[in-house]
C-alpha cells in the first residue's frame, strides 16, 4: 500500500475541532415503593374505622357515666371555640390535610386506590372527602382525654409517620415536576406526623402520671378567663402626659413601625384555635407555593441554558437580531442573558416569600388588636362602622371556611406576586442595569433623553406651584394661616391649567401602579379590605374575616366564659356549704380565726363577683347575647352599646338593676 493510500485512511484529525460531548439529561423512571400506596390505604382505612368504633363506644360509656344524653362527642373532634385547649393536635392534622391537598392536585391519580386517568375530576371530588375522613381519627383520639384514645392515637400516628418515611426513603426521586419535588413537598407532612407521634405518647405519659386533665369541659374551669377579667378590672396606673407638643423622633417612629410587624405573646391573651390553625397552614402554604414555583420553572431554564448552541445565532438572525458576528460570542451572550433571567426569577420568588412572611406577621398583630378591641365593644374602630356582634347565617358560613380561605388567598396571592415581581425585576435588569454596565441597548435612556423638555416642564411646573404656595400664597399671622395674594393665586392656577392636565396624566398612571402593587402585596391578607370603606362588603376576603370575628367574640368572650365558670364554681360551692351545715349539726365547730378568714374571703369573692357581673352587663359586645335585647334595632346601638336616648332605654336600666340586685343578694348571702 502506497503512502498516499495510507494518508487517505488517516483519521487522526477528525476530532481536533469537535465540540465537547454534553452530558445526557437524567431521566427519572417511575418509582413504586416497597410499601404499596394502594395496599397501605386499604389497611389504614380499615384500622381507622376500627379505631373510630372503639372511640365511639368509649364516648358512649363516658356520657352514660356522666348522665349525659345526645350524640357522641366524636361528632365534634375538637372545640374550635375553646381558647384554653392544646392546639398542637388540631394544627398538625390540618397541616397534614393541606399537604395531601397539594399532592393530590398535582398528582395524576388523586385516589391511591385507582390508577385510572380518564375520570380524574370525579376521583378528585372523592379524594377531597376521603382524606379528611382518613385523618379524622388522628384528631378524634385526643377528644375524650382518655388513655385508650392516646394509645390509639400513638399507634395511628406512628403508622402514618413510619409508612411515609419508608416510602420517601425507597423513592427519593420521582418524575413529577422535579426529581426531588415529592421529597421536599412531603417535609411539612413528615414534620406534622412526627409531632403527632411525639405528642400522643406525651399525653399518655401525663395521663398515667395524673397530670393531664381528663375533663372535656375544662374550658370554663380554666384560669385563663379569670386572669383576663382580673387584668381588665385592675386599676391602671396614671400615665404621665408630657406637656411638650414635639413630634416623635425618626428613630422612635422607625422602632414603633418595626414593633408593629413583630408579634410578641401576652400572658393574658391566647389566640383562638381557628386563628392558630390558619397561621400554621398559611406558613405551610407559603412553603409549598415557593417550592412549586422554584421546582416548576428553574429546571426548565437550566435545560434551556444547557441546550444553547451555535444554531441560536441563525435563529436570532431570522428575526433580524445580530448580537455578534462570532457565533461563539452569541452563545455566550445568550447563556448570560438566560442566567440573568434565572436570577430575576429567583429574586422574584424570594421577594414574594419575604413580603408574605411580613404580611403574616403583621396580620397576627392585627388579629390580637381586633379581638381585644371587640372584647371591649369597640366595633367602630375595628369595622369602621356600627355592627352588632351576634351570630348569623353568613357569619357562620364564613367562620367555617376562614382557615381554608386564608390558605387559598395566600397561594393565589403568592403566584400573582411572583409574576408581577418577575416582570418588574426583568425590566429593571434588561432595560436599566445591563445597559448601564455594558453601555449598549440604551433604548430606554434614549427615549427619556428625547423627552427631556417635556419632563423638565412638568418638574418645573410642580416645583413652581410648591414654592409659590410655600412663600407667596400662605400667610402666617398670630399662629394662624390664611391665603395671601389671591389674585396671583388665581392667575397662576389658570396659566398652569394645561400643564396640570399633563401632570394629572402622569399621576393617574402612578396611581394605577401604586394601587395595583398595594392590592397585589396585600392579596393574601384577610384582615384588611382592598376596597373603599363604603364598598367593603364586596371584598369577599375582608367580609369573611369580619364575620369570623363576630362568631369568635360572641361565642368565646373571656368575660362571658369567666362568668359561666363562676356559676359552675358557685354550684359546686353550694354542695360544700350543705356539707358544712351537716358537719355543724353534728357538733363540728371551726376555729374563730378560720371564721374571720372565711368572712374576708367571702367579701372579696362577692366584690369580685359584683365587678364581673357589672362588666358582663355593660360590655357592648355582649349586649346581643341577652334575650330581651334581641329585638333591639340597629339604630338603638352606638358602637355596639345600647343608646341611652333610645325608647328602650328603660329596658337597659332595668337589666342593669336586676343583675345588681342579684349581685347584692349574692354578696349578702356570702
Curated annotation (Swiss-Prot):
Secretion signal, residue range per the UniProt entry: none
Extracellular side: 1-38, 109-121, 167-182, 296-346, 423-452
Example of a GO MF term: molecular adaptor activity
Membrane topology value: Multi-pass membrane protein
Summary of the knockout phenotype: Morpholino knockdown causes severe defects in embryonic development, with microphthalmia, a curved body axis and heart edema. The morphant hearts do not loop normally, heart atria are strongly dilated and blood circulation is severely impaired. Morphants have an altered morphology of the craniofacial skeleton, with malformation of the first and second arches and absence of the branchial arches. Embryonic heads at 4 dpf display reduced total retinyl ester levels and reduced levels of the visual pigment 11-cis-retinal.
Subcellular location: Cell membrane
Entry's transmembrane regions: 39-59, 88-108, 122-142, 146-166, 183-203, 275-295, 347-367, 402-422, 453-473
Membrane-side (Cytoplasmic) residue stretches: 60-87, 143-145, 204-274, 368-401, 474-488, 527-670
Biased composition (Basic and acidic residues): 645-664
Keywords per UniProt: Calmodulin-binding, Cell membrane, Membrane, Receptor, Retinol-binding, Transmembrane, Transmembrane helix, Transport, Vitamin A
GO biological process, one term: vitamin A import into cell
Membrane-inserted regions that do not cross the membrane: 489-526
Annotated segments matching region Disordered: 640-670
Keyword Membrane belongs to the record: yes
Region described as Interaction with calmodulin: 600-626
GO cellular component: plasma membrane
Pfam families according to UniProt: RBP_receptor
Entry's free-text remark on domains: Contrary to predictions, contains nine transmembrane helices, with an extracellular N-terminus and a cytoplasmic C-terminus. Besides, contains one long helix that dips into the membrane and then runs more or less parallel to the membrane surface.
Subunit structure: Homodimer. Interacts (via C-terminus) with calmodulin.
Name assigned to this protein: Receptor for retinol uptake stra6
Species this chain originates from: Danio rerio (Zebrafish)
Amino acid at each position: 500500500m502506497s503512502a498516499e493510500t495510507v494518508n487517505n485512511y488517516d483519521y487522526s484529525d477528525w476530532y481536533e475541532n469537535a465540540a465537547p460531548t454534553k452530558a445526557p439529561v437524567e431521566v427519572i423512571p417511575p418509582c413504586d415503593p416497597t410499601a404499596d400506596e394502594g395496599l397501605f390505604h386499604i389497611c389504614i382505612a380499615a384500622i381507622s374505622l376500627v379505631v373510630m368504633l372503639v372511640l365511639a363506644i368509649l364516648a358512649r360509656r363516658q356520657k352514660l357515666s356522666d348522665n349525659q344524653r345526645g350524640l357522641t362527642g366524636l361528632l365534634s373532634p375538637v372545640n374550635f371555640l375553646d381558647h384554653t385547649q392544646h392546639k398542637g393536635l388540631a394544627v398538625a392534622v390540618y397541616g397534614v390535610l393541606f399537604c395531601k391537598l397539594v399532592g393530590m392536585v398535582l398528582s395524576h391519580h388523586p385516589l391511591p386506590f385507582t390508577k385510572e386517568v380518564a375520570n380524574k375530576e370525579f376521583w378528585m371530588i372523592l379524594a377531597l372527602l376521603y382524606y379528611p375522613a382518613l385523618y379524622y381519627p388522628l384528631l378524634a383520639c385526643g377528644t375524650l382525654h382518655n388513655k385508650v384514645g392516646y394509645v390509639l392515637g400513638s399507634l395511628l400516628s406512628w403508622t402514618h409517620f413510619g409508612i411515609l418515611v419508608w416510602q420517601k426513603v425507597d423513592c427519593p426521586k420521582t418524575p413529577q415536576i422535579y426529581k426531588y419535588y415529592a421529597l421536599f413537598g412531603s417535609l411539612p407532612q413528615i414534620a406534622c406526623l412526627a409531632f403527632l407521634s411525639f405528642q400522643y405518647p406525651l399525653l399518655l405519659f401525663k395521663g398515667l402520671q395524673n397530670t393531664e386533665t381528663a375533663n372535656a369541659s375544662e374550658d370554663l374551669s380554666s384560669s385563663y378567663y379569670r386572669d383576663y377579667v382580673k387584668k381588665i378590672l385592675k386599676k391602671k396606673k396614671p400615665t404621665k402626659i408630657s406637656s411638650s407638643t414635639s413630634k416623635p423622633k425618626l428613630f422612635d417612629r422607625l422602632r414603633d413601625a418595626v414593633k408593629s410587624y413583630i408579634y410578641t405573646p401576652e400572658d393574658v391573651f391566647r389566640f383562638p384555635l381557628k386563628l392558630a390553625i390558619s397561621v400554621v397552614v398559611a406558613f405551610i402554604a407559603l412553603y409549598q407555593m415557593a417550592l412549586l414555583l422554584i421546582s416548576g420553572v428553574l429546571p426548565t431554564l437550566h435545560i434551556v441554558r444547557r441546550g444553547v448552541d451555535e444554531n441560536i445565532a441563525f435563529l436570532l438572525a431570522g428575526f433580524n437580531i445580530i448580537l455578534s458576528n462570532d457565533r461563539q460570542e452569541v452563545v455566550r451572550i445568550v447563556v448570560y442573558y438566560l442566567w440573568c433571567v434565572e436570577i430575576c426569577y429567583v429574586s422574584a420568588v424570594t421577594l414574594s416569600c419575604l413580603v408574605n412572611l411580613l404580611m403574616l406577621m403583621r396580620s397576627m398583630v392585627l388579629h390580637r388588636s381586633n379581638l381585644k378591641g371587640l372584647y371591649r365593644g369597640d366595633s367602630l374602630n375595628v369595622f369602621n362602622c356600627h355592627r352588632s356582634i351576634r351570630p348569623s347565617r353568613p357569619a357562620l358560613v364564613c367562620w367555617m371556611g376562614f382557615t381554608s380561605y386564608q390558605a387559598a388567598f395566600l397561594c393565589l396571592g403568592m403566584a400573582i406576586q411572583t409574576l408581577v415581581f418577575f416582570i418588574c425585576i426583568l425590566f429593571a435588569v434588561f432595560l436599566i442595569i445591563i445597559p448601564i454596565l455594558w453601555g449598549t441597548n440604551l433604548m430606554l435612556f434614549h427615549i427619556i433623553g428625547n423627552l427631556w423638555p417635556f419632563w423638565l416642564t412638568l418638574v418645573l411646573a410642580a416645583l413652581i406651584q410648591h414654592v409659590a404656595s410655600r412663600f407667596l400664597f400662605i400667610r402666617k399671622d398670630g399662629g394662624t394661616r390664611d391665603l395671601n395674594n389671591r389674585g396671583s393665586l388665581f392667575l397662576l392656577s389658570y396659566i398652569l391649567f394645561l400643564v396640570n392636565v399633563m401632570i394629572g396624566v402622569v399621576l393617574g398612571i402612578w396611581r394605577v401602579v401604586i394601587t395595583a402593587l398595594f392590592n397585589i402585596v396585600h392579596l393574601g391578607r384577610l384582615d384588611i379590605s382592598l376596597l373603599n370603606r363604603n364598598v367593603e362588603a364586596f371584598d369577599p376576603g375582608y367580609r369573611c374575616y369580619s364575620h369570623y370575628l363576630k362568631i369568635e367574640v360572641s361565642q368565646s368572650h373571656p368575660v362571658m366564659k369567666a362568668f359561666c365558670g363562676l356559676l359552675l364554681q358557685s354550684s359546686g360551692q353550694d354542695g360544700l356549704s350543705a356539707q358544712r351545715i351537716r358537719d355543724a349539726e353534728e357538733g363540728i365547730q371551726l376555729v374563730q380565726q378560720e371564721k374571720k378568714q372565711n368572712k374576708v374571703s367571702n367579701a372579696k369573692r362577692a366584690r369580685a363577683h359584683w365587678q364581673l357581673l357589672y362588666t358582663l352587663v355593660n360590655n357592648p359586645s355582649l349586649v346581643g347575647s341577652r334575650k330581651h335585647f334581641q329585638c333591639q334595632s340597629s339604630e338603638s346601638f352606638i358602637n355596639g352599646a345600647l343608646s341611652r336616648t333610645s325608647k328602650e332605654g328603660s329596658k337597659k336600666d332595668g337589666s342593669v338593676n336586676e343583675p345588681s340586685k342579684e349581685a347584692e343578694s349574692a354578696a349578702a348571702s356570702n
